Swiss-Prot record:
It holds the Pfam family RPN6_C_helix. This is 26S proteasome non-ATPase regulatory subunit 11. Keywords: Phosphoprotein, Proteasome. The modification Phosphoserine is found at S24. It comes from Drosophila melanogaster. Residues 224-392 form the PCI domain. The gene is Rpn6. One of its GO terms (biological process) is ubiquitin-dependent protein catabolic process. Component of the lid subcomplex of the 19S proteasome regulatory particle complex (also named PA700 complex). The 26S proteasome consists of a 20S proteasome core and two 19S regulatory subunits. Interacts with alien/CSN2. Interacts with Prosalpha2 and Rpt6.
Length: 422
């Protein structure tokens, strides 16, 4: 069969000197009209050939060629059912977006596909592509565009009752609001997504994404790392069951929760489990280094870990936010430990002891005094920190007030009883 021969040729393409072969094969795959147009077997083989060609381009990192393939297949898509065409387009677009090639044409390609779907009056395909465009806007930090398109799409989906896509868009909306630090709206969007998800079957990947976002919001908003850990664990198990790369992210955030809870000793125990052994690598090594520095309360080790694992720590927005809090806590603990024996100490000595620039130490000490972490003043003229002794609070006045209030209640009660007798 001619279609089968084309499919075999697509599979057998070599990785060098084949641009002309690619072009010739594509033309035959999408324009060859031999045989009946309603031949299901022939259509199936063409679909497989197109997907195989797309997979080859993805593996070889040929983003431009894959984008051209998506456009070239449109005449063929018009001759098959809407459901098959939608599945084929979504698969090719997903391949292109999964490449992370950074060509700069991702947004425009999605828009072109959406425009084509509008012209062909393929509503469900358009909505599915718009959901992918929202995800692309989120990944490229175009949050305003993501929210605008999301609001429009949500109105349509609620009318059509497409719950699977509705969950996806509501989850993206929650992520976008979180990125904008609008935590109340992020929580509201996530609650809507969970409510919708409860009414349908959610694949492990979608359920894992919901659990992951729940953990992130609990950690960010309420600093409830214990509950966040539970959600991250559920997400990890869900992603692990489908071999998703997000499982590593979930495990990383689980370790972060343990560190923030002051349970750094549990980190090694977690990463030695059967499930976690599969995910060993730089991300896990980075969290182990931070856990060790936290356990030792060593700022030097902490900064060394941040420097060595910059990509894994500083470039992860979620981890960076919480490690900033952890660094501040460790810095305060170290400063309190250094100044504790003194009533008057040179700021230069404190800076030297903690191995940080003097202006940074002065700023932090001033902040700690204002936050009432200790009593004292900074004499910048002399360059010294004067620490006051903690004077015990005299509670005599408080106790007198409590006694007077109690006596007042007794007198009021006696008055009410006397009033009844009279």
């Amino acid at each position: 069969m001619a279609g089968a021969t084309l499919f075999e040729r697509a599979q057998a393409l070599s990785s060098v000197n084949r641009e002309e072969q690619d072009s010739s094969l594509l033309n035959k795959l999408v324009r060859d009209q031999e045989g009946a147009e309603n031949d299901e077997e022939r259509i199936r083989i063409k679909e497989q050939g197109i997907l195989q060609q797309g997979e080859l381009y993805k593996q070889e990192g040929k983003a431009k060629e894959l984008a051209d393939l998506i456009k070239v297949t449109r005449p063929f898509l018009s001759s098959i059912s809407k459901a098959k065409a939608a599945k084929l387009v979504r698969s090719l677009v997903d391949m292109f977006l999964d490449m992370d090639a950074g060509t700069g044409i991702e947004v425009q390609l999605c828009k072109d596909c959406i425009e084509w779907a509008k012209q062909e009056k393929r509503t469900f395909l358009r909505q599915s592509l718009e959901a992918r465009l929202i995800a692309l806007y989120f990944d490229t930090a175009l949050y305003t565009e993501a929210l605008a398109l999301g609001a429009q799409l949500l109105r349509e989906l609620k009318k059509l009752d497409d719950k699977n896509l509705l969950v996806e868009v509501q989850l993206l909306e929650s992520k976008t609001y979180h990125a904008l630090s609008n935590l109340p709206k992020a929580r509201a969007a996530l609650t809507s997504a969970r409510t919708t998800a409860n009414a349908i079957y959610c694949p492990p990947k979608v359920q894992g994404a919901l659990d992951l976002q729940s953990g992130i919001l609990h950690a960010a908003d309420e600093r409830d790392f214990k509950t966040a850990f539970s959600y991250f664990y559920e997400a990890f198990e869900g992603f692990d069951s489908v071999d998703s790369v997000k499982a590593l992210t979930s495990l990383k955030y689980m370790l972060l929760c343990k560190i923030m809870l002051g349970q750094s000793d549990d980190v090694n125990q977690l990463v030695s489990g059967k499930l976690a052994i599969t995910y060993s690598g730089r991300d896990i090594d980075a969290m182990k280094s931070v856990a060790e520095a936290s356990h030792k309360r060593s700022l030097a080790d902490f900064q060394a870990a941040l420097k060595e694992y910059k990509k894994e720590l500083a470039e992860d927005v979620i981890v960076q936010a919480h490690l900033g809090t952890l660094y501040d806590t460790m810095l305060e603990q170290n400063l309190c430990r250094i100044i504790e024996p003194y009533s008057r100490v040179q700021v230069a000595h404190v800076a030297e002891s903690i191995q940080l620039p003097m202006p940074q130490v002065e700023k932090k000490l001033s902040q700690m005094i204002l936050d009432k972490k200790f009593s004292g003043i900074l004499d910048q003229g002399e360059g010294v920190l004067i620490v006051f002794e903690e004077t015990p609070v005299d509670k005599t006045y408080e106790r007198v007030l409590e006694t007077i209030q109690s006596m007042g209640k007794v007198v009021d009660t006696l008055y009410q009883k006397a009033k009844k007798l009279s």
